Amino acid sequence: MKELKYDVLIIGGGFAGSSAAYQLSRRGLKILLVDSKPWNRIGDKPCGDAVSKAHFDKLGMPYPKGEELENKINGIKLYSPDMQTVWTVNGEGFELNAPLYNQRVLKEAQDRGVEIWDLTTAMKPIFEDGYVKGAVLFNRRTNEELTVYSKVVVEATGYSRSFRSKLPPELPITEDLDDKDADVAYREVLLTKEDIEDHDYLRIFIDQETSPGGYWWYFPKGKNKVNVGLGIQGGMGYPSIHEYYKKYLDKYAPDVDKSKLLVKGGALVPTRRPLYTMAWNGIIVIGDSGFTVNPVHGGGKGSAMISGYCAAKAILSAFETGDFSASGLWDMNICYVNEYGAKQASLDIFRRFLQKLSNDDINYGMKKKIIKEEDLLEASEKGDLHLSVADKAMRVISGLGRPSLLFKLKAVAESMKKIKELYLNYPRSPSSLGSWRREVDNVLTEFNKSLS
């Protein structure tokens, strides 16, 4: 079998993998990125396709341009189940043609020295002496099996986790996903019968009957094209997502022309805190495989780019020291936790709270402003839910009709603060991971009890 050597092997060329490749390019490293899809389908993952502009600015990633940019977004409108209350949260973003943008980032990385193979599958890890040292690949273009050795493997295989799942199960990096900590999602892109009103605002509809544990979305891709879909919580025994889509599409997108269907597809999405560790001996895990998706709104492209940025940062540091052990790559965890993971863990608490609410609770809470737009904005941006003394008093008055909701909100705020502080005090070395993880699990267990 043919053997090749690289400094870095990136498995998966979606938003996470392509970002890591882009950030690592022109740094003097020999890098190979492989993806199992043909080039023109890399990055083609069914989702809402919306990304905050702030992510591009912070990470130095190129803005989408031309056909990659389908719509500029100025905010989100959030609808209560009874449609009587609408909150508006302002913020700039892009509605993307995600595959086109993804492929351009890959092409730029390629132009800067990264080698890219499409139609190539990582068959199994090379695992020796407790380290991931590469992978056995099968290239369907050349119809050959190859052994590729590398100092670091970046696992960016998405929800399938198809590479790290083949590692010895005792490694912390192989952590599995509870079905209830994931959403099943489905979406279609259709043309509309007439121009969309306020086409620069995304619409999100919360309803525990039409999308239990998730939400419906209506994301304009211009004046007469829309990405419409829904997510529902996994592991709950709910009916097929296609049943919900067919039954309720007219309620949320009455303006679409069903004969003008452009794209359709479904996906599974992790909606929890990130992996307890995203780095181990010779390996870093990013993107959906590292559970980097926002637990509340299910968006994963921005946080995937953050994880790619952190992977590049940790890898460059490891090459400076020559240490590719878990300790040498530990900066991956520190970087991601500080950039996004602490907030994400806090939002995992908020997600659990929202999924337990009834439609009546949500209608009442939004109408009476027991939960406010400012709460949502602060939670989404920082992972915080701060309630001042005066604010608490006003909420008590508003919440007299539903004291249990107010009590739960207090428990939510406290648990969000606890878990965020734990993540901001993430262990500085692998030796402390086990005790820290037990503390996190205790917070989650206690919070789940408070919701019962």
Curated annotation (Swiss-Prot):
Monomer. It comes from the Archaea. FAD binds at F15, A16, D35, S36, K45, P46, C47, G48, D49, A50, A122, D288, G300, K301. Binds 1 FAD per subunit. Belongs to the geranylgeranyl reductase family. Disulfide bonds join C310-C335. Keywords: Disulfide bond, FAD, Flavoprotein, Lipid biosynthesis, Lipid metabolism, Oxidoreductase, Phospholipid biosynthesis, Phospholipid metabolism. This is Digeranylgeranylglycerophospholipid reductase. Pfam families: DAO (PF01266), GGR_cat (PF22578). It catalyses: a 2,3-bis-O-phytanyl-sn-glycerol 1-phospholipid + 8 A = a 2,3-bis-O-(geranylgeranyl)-sn-glycerol 1-phospholipid + 8 AH2; 2,3-bis-O-(phytanyl)-sn-glycerol 1-phosphate + 8 A = 2,3-bis-O-(geranylgeranyl)-sn-glycerol 1-phosphate + 8 AH2; sn-3-O-phytanylglycerol 1-phosphate + 4 A = sn-3-O-(geranylgeranyl)glycerol 1-phosphate + 4 AH2; phytyl diphosphate + 3 A = (2E,6E,10E)-geranylgeranyl diphosphate + 3 AH2. A 2,3-bis-O-phytanyl-sn-glycerol 1-phospholipid binds at H55, H297, Y340. Its cofactor is FAD. Optimum temperature is 55 degrees Celsius for the reduction of GGPP to the hexahydro-product H(6)GGPP.
